[in-house]
Regions:
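Conserved phosphate/oxyanion-binding catalytic-loop motifs
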Residues: 101
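Asp-based, Mg2+/Mn2+-dependent phosphohydrolase catalytic module
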Residues: 2-93, 104-126, 130-318
Length: 318
């Protein structure tokens, strides 16, 4: 997800610190600074420009849609997209949501999409939170320290996990760390976690790799920002579960109709370093939304040239 200065709306951000007045250039620069931890892009090819999803529908059987910038801006569905999604389904297309929302339970996500007018079933939504929770099956049971907001409750969270707040003992006693949302995070807590990892390196699993997210006054710092800082300071390399990393796409692949070739699947999003890079690395085709979200109508050509992450399609709108 992303946003361009001057066209911001409130949305369900799980970030805390706000970069007042920050714009796309700030976010782009920060993503480029952590490219050494991101997947490698495919060899670039010239993208095809089209008007909207209907214009490319004949090429694909499955559409993986990011949420912000594709389905909605803030608490509003993007005009025409509810009908567009319904129309794709009527044409026999499978439509899934693939989102880095990790800070709140699946029930909150589904209620939000319902409120916006979408009719996604539970199996139609794949989140980085789901990917992380599934990934826990590969880890022995332990006492996890949680970077998450207590206000969203304990639904879906592992038994015995402890919310990390201002008590240094909780950081010392945790046997590993889960970063889900940053809305209750602070520089004081970041310093406590950094020191805890230096004193006793432990696993750091990150549900939301986003560095920033849009809010009314600028950009909020998201879990990915804090995770990369922790890695640089402590030497502990995080394990990321959301876009652009493989785990969320592996989970999405389990939901895709059996036998669907990868080149008949398209990842649609507004952000080069998450949606497009991740979809491409997973072997799917990709479509960048130019008219909403990160670019909000600005021409993405300079950014594409600057980072070498090239979508297969550039769409004016979803």
């Amino acid at each position: 997800m992303g946003i361009r200065q001057g066209a911001r709306s409130h949305h369900l951000s799980t970030g805390a610190a706000i970069l007042e007045g920050a714009d796309t250039a700030v976010a782009f620069t920060e993503y480029e600074s952590v490219r050494h931890r991101l997947p490698a892009p495919r060899a670039p090819m010239a993208p095809v420009r089209a008007e909207h999803l209907d214009a490319i529908a004949d090429h694909f059987d499955v559409f993986l849609l990011d949420a912000f910038g594709v389905l909605n801006i803030g608490e509003r569905a993007i005009p025409g997209v509810v009908d567009r999604v319904n129309g794709l389904r009527q044409r026999g297309k499978q439509v899934l949501v693939v989102t880095n929302a990790a800070g709140y339970p699946s029930s909150v996500l589904h209620e939000r999409y319902r409120r916006l007018g979408y009719s996604f079933e539970t199996s139609d939504v794949v989140s980085s939170r789901m990917a992380l929770l599934k990934g826990l099956s590969n880890h022995a049971h332990r006492k996890w320290g949680l970077v998450a907001a207590p206000k969203f409750g304990r639904e879906e969270l592992p038994e015995g996990a402890v919310f990390l707040e201002d008590d240094p003992a909780a950081y010392a006693e945790a046997e590993g760390f889960l970063m889900l949302g940053a809305s209750a995070w602070s520089e004081t807590r970041q310093a406590l976690l950094e020191q805890a990892l230096k004193d006793n390196p432990r696993e750091l699993l990150v549900g939301n790799p986003d560095l920033v997210a849009p809010v009314e006054s600028g950009l909020s710092r998201e879990p990915g920002h804090y995770a990369h800082r922790l890695a640089s300071a402590s030497g502990v390399e995080p394990v990321f579960y959301g876009k652009p990393f493989p785990a969320i796409f592996d989970l999405a692949r389990e939901r895709i109709r059996p036998g669907t070739p990868d080149d008949r699947v398209v990842m649609v999003g507004d952000t080069l370093h998450t949606d497009i890079l991740g979809g491409s690395a997973a072997g799917f085709r990709t479509a960048l939304i130019q008219g909403y979200g990160f670019f909000d109508g600005a021409d993405p050509d300079a950014s594409i040239a600057g980072c070498g992450i090239t979508p297969d399609f550039i769409l004016d709108r979803p």
